[in-house]
């Protein structure tokens, strides 16, 4: 459960991420593919090279979904319901991959906003991403 301080930290962080969400999403995906090569198996039809249009497009989807989640912190299940269905029933993504992408997202945000990435913000974003991951895997049962 996100505390009021966590919610403030997440909203503040996403205020700074703002127009860069698609860029950061793509960068986090690239980090994930490089650091955890087994994650590439879910994207056999993608050009996974640096800067590819497909990775950028998927990064935009990731960024948009996280921005939507940050805008609906008090009702993540409703905000992410369609995405949860997609990942559970059609894509069947192994839940561990959400943790890997979350880690890469944190690294990306820290790299772009080192002065703002305090331990408190780090903890809040980590909780937020864990909550998003929980919602996305909630329909796997």
Swiss-Prot record:
<dbReference type="InterPro" id="IPR050056">
    <property type="entry name" value="Hemoglobin_oxygen_transport"/>
</dbReference>
<dbReference type="GO" id="GO:0031838">
    <property type="term" value="C:haptoglobin-hemoglobin complex"/>
</dbReference>
<dbReference type="InterPro" id="IPR012292">
    <property type="entry name" value="Globin/Proto"/>
</dbReference>
<feature type="modified residue" description="Phosphoserine">
    <location>
        <position position="124"/>
    </location>
</feature>
<feature type="modified residue" description="Phosphothreonine">
    <location>
        <position position="137"/>
    </location>
</feature>
<dbReference type="GO" id="GO:0042744">
    <property type="term" value="P:hydrogen peroxide catabolic process"/>
</dbReference>
<feature type="modified residue" description="Phosphoserine">
    <location>
        <position position="102"/>
    </location>
</feature>
<dbReference type="GO" id="GO:0019825">
    <property type="term" value="F:oxygen binding"/>
</dbReference>
<protein>
    <recommendedName>
        <fullName>Hemoglobin subunit alpha</fullName>
    </recommendedName>
</protein>
<comment type="function">
    <text>Involved in oxygen transport from the lung to the various peripheral tissues.</text>
</comment>
<feature type="modified residue" description="N6-succinyllysine">
    <location>
        <position position="7"/>
    </location>
</feature>
<dbReference type="GO" id="GO:0031720">
    <property type="term" value="F:haptoglobin binding"/>
</dbReference>
<feature type="modified residue" description="N6-acetyllysine; alternate">
    <location>
        <position position="16"/>
    </location>
</feature>
<dbReference type="InterPro" id="IPR009050">
    <property type="entry name" value="Globin-like_sf"/>
</dbReference>
<dbReference type="InterPro" id="IPR000971">
    <property type="entry name" value="Globin"/>
</dbReference>
<feature type="modified residue" description="Phosphotyrosine">
    <location>
        <position position="24"/>
    </location>
</feature>
<feature type="modified residue" description="Phosphothreonine">
    <location>
        <position position="108"/>
    </location>
</feature>
<dbReference type="Pfam" id="PF00042">
    <property type="entry name" value="Globin"/>
</dbReference>
<dbReference type="GO" id="GO:0005506">
    <property type="term" value="F:iron ion binding"/>
</dbReference>
<keyword id="KW-0007">Acetylation</keyword>
<keyword id="KW-0813">Transport</keyword>
<dbReference type="GO" id="GO:0043177">
    <property type="term" value="F:organic acid binding"/>
</dbReference>
<dbReference type="GO" id="GO:0005833">
    <property type="term" value="C:hemoglobin complex"/>
</dbReference>
<feature type="domain" description="Globin">
    <location>
        <begin position="1"/>
        <end position="141"/>
    </location>
</feature>
<comment type="similarity">
    <text>Belongs to the globin family.</text>
</comment>
<feature type="modified residue" description="N6-succinyllysine">
    <location>
        <position position="40"/>
    </location>
</feature>
<keyword id="KW-0597">Phosphoprotein</keyword>
<feature type="modified residue" description="N6-succinyllysine; alternate">
    <location>
        <position position="16"/>
    </location>
</feature>
<feature type="binding site">
    <location>
        <position position="58"/>
    </location>
    <ligand>
        <name>O2</name>
    </ligand>
</feature>
<feature type="binding site" description="proximal binding residue">
    <location>
        <position position="87"/>
    </location>
    <ligand>
        <name>heme b</name>
    </ligand>
</feature>
<keyword id="KW-0561">Oxygen transport</keyword>
<dbReference type="GO" id="GO:0072562">
    <property type="term" value="C:blood microparticle"/>
</dbReference>
<keyword id="KW-0349">Heme</keyword>
<feature type="modified residue" description="Phosphoserine">
    <location>
        <position position="49"/>
    </location>
</feature>
<dbReference type="InterPro" id="IPR002339">
    <property type="entry name" value="Hemoglobin_pi"/>
</dbReference>
<comment type="subunit">
    <text>Heterotetramer of two alpha chains and two beta chains.</text>
</comment>
<feature type="modified residue" description="Phosphoserine">
    <location>
        <position position="3"/>
    </location>
</feature>
<feature type="modified residue" description="Phosphoserine">
    <location>
        <position position="138"/>
    </location>
</feature>
<feature type="modified residue" description="Phosphothreonine">
    <location>
        <position position="134"/>
    </location>
</feature>
<dbReference type="GO" id="GO:0005344">
    <property type="term" value="F:oxygen carrier activity"/>
</dbReference>
<keyword id="KW-0408">Iron</keyword>
<keyword id="KW-0479">Metal-binding</keyword>
């Amino acid at each position: 459960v996100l505390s009021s301080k966590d919610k403030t930290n997440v909203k503040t962080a996403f205020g700074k991420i703002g127009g860069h969400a698609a860029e950061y999403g793509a960068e986090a995906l690239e980090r994930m593919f490089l650091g955890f090569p087994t994650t590439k198996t879910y994207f056999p039809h993608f050009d996974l090279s640096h800067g590819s249009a497909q990775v950028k497009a998927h990064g935009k989807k990731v960024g948009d979904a996280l921005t939507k989640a940050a805008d609906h912190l008090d009702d993540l299940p409703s905000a992410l319901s369609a995405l949860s269905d997609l990942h559970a029933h059609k894509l069947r993504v192994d839940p561990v991959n959400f943790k890997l992408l979350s880690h890469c997202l944190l690294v990306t945000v820290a790299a772009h906003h080192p002065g703002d990435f305090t331990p408190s913000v780090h903890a809040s974003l980590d909780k937020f991403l864990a909550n998003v991951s929980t919602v996305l895997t909630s329909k796997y049962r």
